[in-house]
Amino acid sequence: MTIHEAAAQGNIGIVRQHLAIHPGGYVNTRTPSDWTPLHFAYGQGRQEMSRFLLDNGADYEAKNKLGQAPADIPLLKLNLKNSQFALVELYTSESCSSCPPAERLTAEIRRMALAKRLNIFCVSFHVDYFDGGSWSDGFSDGRFSARQRAYEHKRFSGMYYTPQMIVNGKYQTLGHKRANAFDAINRSLKLPATVAVSVRQVKKEDGAIAVNACTMGKFENAALCVALVEHGIQRRITGGENKGRTLSMDNVVLEFKCVELAGPVGHEFTFDLKQVPGGKRRNLGAVAFVQRTDNMAMLGAQSTRIHWQPGEKPDKEPSREFE
């Protein structure tokens, strides 16, 4: 066990052994992300361990690659009793005539989650394989189509269509099948998360939004991802299967980024709103999650509101209550 793992687990005996073997400044040894043992102790709420490290020369002001001192690390201690979650992904297109009912169902799921304070997070990925001819989806992205194909390859053999709803990377159904959707969500909400995730907006300047997402745990074949989403979009469609209709859309993914995990990680994701599609860029949010890359199963998720309008300030604490 490394000194960082021991600090996160509160194992003072193991930490003491490391310090005896490596006298001097080993108490401040760093990971590739520049986390010290004290960062891990703070992130897990290990007060006794934190005091022990400080008594043995830990640097209280040591900064990781995000510029965070140990006291700046969000609490990443996982409360298994309250960590159940469901990440609902909808694969959709403005050019798909079967998709509007699925869009409405996903919006209903989000409203229910907010009203009941459930850890249900919704993201709608617009695929690009409907584009062409008389209409191209303004939110489509080839990367989103590739993500759906990854599910087909790694999890759901032969299952590749719109509207497709995928819950926690484990269950899939037609996106407008209400009973199937809620069955998958209820199954997911019976199982605790296995990692803690924190996400918050950290700055905003000149068309860019920065989101700090952190997670902690032992990872293999996993990635930390953040989706920038917008709610309350209305679009008049003038071509394709939905020609003549005005579509109302929530949870629309404007931009999506991932980093592979090799241990506890804090990462800053920057989104340039000048370069992403969008409506009025109001009602923005960020959904962060940790997902296995081998079988696509979700390990944990969280969300926060994104402030973009002039005069708005970032939330001090993460919140899933954005509209």
Stretches found by the model and what they are:
Residues 11-20, 46-54:
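Ankyrin repeat structural motif
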Residues 100-114:
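Typically the conserved alpha-helix immediately C-terminal to a functionally engaged Cys/Sec
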Residues 117-145:
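Thiol-based oxidoreductase modules, predominantly thioredoxin-like and allied folds used
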Residues 5-11, 40-46, 73-76:
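Ankyrin repeat A-helix N-terminal signature
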